[in-house]
């Protein structure tokens, strides 16, 4: 049997829309082993009641992708999923499922495929690399397409605490994409290029105070924030409490803040959301340098 930990991820990091993602230090767990049955799937944890236990399970779909790539047929498998990454909250739950299935199946078969091939397959299943790249590789990853090929670079991992505020309502990516305009003003696009330049420079130079502007976004947050009560008030109060920068995680509704120390920031976010009638779970975590490929049968923070 093999066991893999897959980190949660925050994509669209600040102004890095469809380009920059960061792995976080809390995890889903995928275990794969033999079974006397054709297929046996157990699911525990967040959203377990919503996850299929048949061949439509996304982790299993990813597993079959590896078997097919190697000319094999998956038979007599037991799949156990322990989920901490919440569904449809902007923390890469589908990417975690895809990467977990690919890495577990590859390890189960002796690790014949290299990480770049795993990333290609993950991107093929997910449709874009901005969540699957940090889930697979860890750290902060800039990723995108050069024609039909996935390209990526890893940035220095920021030495910060990450405050993750998860509102207690779902926001599916497909729904939140519908609110995005087909076009934005040229001046808005220029401003976003400026801000993402500050984001990258702040990480590379460890000048985290520049994340005050380096986490600002003008491509998607002005529109998606309409679906999240009190979003901009949350941003302002978090900054007043000491956050370097604040942004939506993925397509939302989760909000992340980067800070030297997170407790005061977390309290400010929680209280501000409550003022708008929104309950939010607050998680204090850090960027995760390791991806799923580094966390096979890992003994540490997870249960593998």
Curated annotation (Swiss-Prot):
<dbReference type="InterPro" id="IPR006204">
    <property type="entry name" value="GHMP_kinase_N_dom"/>
</dbReference>
<dbReference type="InterPro" id="IPR020568">
    <property type="entry name" value="Ribosomal_Su5_D2-typ_SF"/>
</dbReference>
<dbReference type="InterPro" id="IPR036554">
    <property type="entry name" value="GHMP_kinase_C_sf"/>
</dbReference>
<keyword id="KW-0028">Amino-acid biosynthesis</keyword>
<keyword id="KW-0963">Cytoplasm</keyword>
<dbReference type="Pfam" id="PF08544">
    <property type="entry name" value="GHMP_kinases_C"/>
</dbReference>
<keyword id="KW-0808">Transferase</keyword>
<comment type="similarity">
    <text>Belongs to the GHMP kinase family. Homoserine kinase subfamily.</text>
</comment>
<keyword id="KW-0418">Kinase</keyword>
<dbReference type="GO" id="GO:0009088">
    <property type="term" value="P:threonine biosynthetic process"/>
</dbReference>
<dbReference type="InterPro" id="IPR000870">
    <property type="entry name" value="Homoserine_kinase"/>
</dbReference>
<dbReference type="InterPro" id="IPR014721">
    <property type="entry name" value="Ribsml_uS5_D2-typ_fold_subgr"/>
</dbReference>
<keyword id="KW-0067">ATP-binding</keyword>
<dbReference type="InterPro" id="IPR013750">
    <property type="entry name" value="GHMP_kinase_C_dom"/>
</dbReference>
<dbReference type="GO" id="GO:0005524">
    <property type="term" value="F:ATP binding"/>
</dbReference>
<keyword id="KW-0547">Nucleotide-binding</keyword>
<protein>
    <recommendedName>
        <fullName>Homoserine kinase</fullName>
        <ecNumber>2.7.1.39</ecNumber>
    </recommendedName>
</protein>
<dbReference type="Pfam" id="PF00288">
    <property type="entry name" value="GHMP_kinases_N"/>
</dbReference>
<dbReference type="GO" id="GO:0005737">
    <property type="term" value="C:cytoplasm"/>
</dbReference>
<comment type="function">
    <text>Catalyzes the ATP-dependent phosphorylation of L-homoserine to L-homoserine phosphate.</text>
</comment>
<dbReference type="GO" id="GO:0004413">
    <property type="term" value="F:homoserine kinase activity"/>
</dbReference>
<keyword id="KW-0791">Threonine biosynthesis</keyword>
<comment type="pathway">
    <text>Amino-acid biosynthesis; L-threonine biosynthesis; L-threonine from L-aspartate: step 4/5.</text>
</comment>
<dbReference type="InterPro" id="IPR006203">
    <property type="entry name" value="GHMP_knse_ATP-bd_CS"/>
</dbReference>
<feature type="binding site">
    <location>
        <begin position="86"/>
        <end position="96"/>
    </location>
    <ligand>
        <name>ATP</name>
    </ligand>
</feature>
């Amino acid at each position: 049997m093999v066991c893999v930990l897959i980190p949660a991820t925050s994509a669209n990091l600040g102004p890095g829309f469809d380009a920059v993602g960061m792995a976080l230090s809390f995890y889903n767990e995928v275990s794969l082993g033999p079974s006397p049955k054709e297929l046996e799937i157990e699911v525990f944890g967040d959203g377990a009641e919503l996850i299929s236990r048949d061949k439509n399970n996304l982790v299993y779909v990813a597993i079959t992708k590896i078997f097919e790539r190697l000319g094999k047929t998956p038979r007599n498998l037991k799949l156990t999923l322990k989920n901490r990454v919440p569904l449809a909250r902007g923390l890469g739950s589908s990417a975690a499922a895809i990467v977990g299935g690919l890495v577990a199946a590859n390890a189960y078969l002796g690790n014949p495929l290299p990480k770049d091939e795993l990333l290609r397959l993950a991107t093929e299943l997910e449709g874009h690399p901005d969540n699957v790249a940090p889930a697979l590789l860890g750290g902060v990853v800039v990723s995108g397409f050069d024609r039909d090929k996935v390209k990526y670079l890893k940035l220095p991992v920021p030495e910060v605490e990450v405050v993750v505020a998860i509102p207690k309502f779902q926001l599916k990516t497909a729904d939140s994409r519908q609110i995005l305009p087909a076009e934005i003003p040229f001046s808005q696009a220029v401003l976003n290029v400026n801000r993402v330049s500050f984001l990258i420079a702040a990480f590379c130079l460890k000048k985290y105070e520049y994340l005050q502007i380096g986490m600002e976004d003008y491509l998607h947050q002005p529109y998606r924030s309409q679906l999240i009560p009190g979003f901009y008030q949350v941003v302002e109060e978090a900054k007043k409490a000491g956050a370097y920068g604040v942004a939506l995680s993925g397509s939302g509704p989760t909000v992340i803040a980067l800070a030297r120390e997170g407790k005061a920031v977390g309290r400010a976010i929680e209280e501000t959301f409550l003022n708008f009638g929104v309950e939010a779970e607050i998680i204090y975590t850090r960027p995760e340098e390791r991806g799923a490929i580094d966390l096979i049968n890992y003994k540490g923070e997870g249960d593998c």
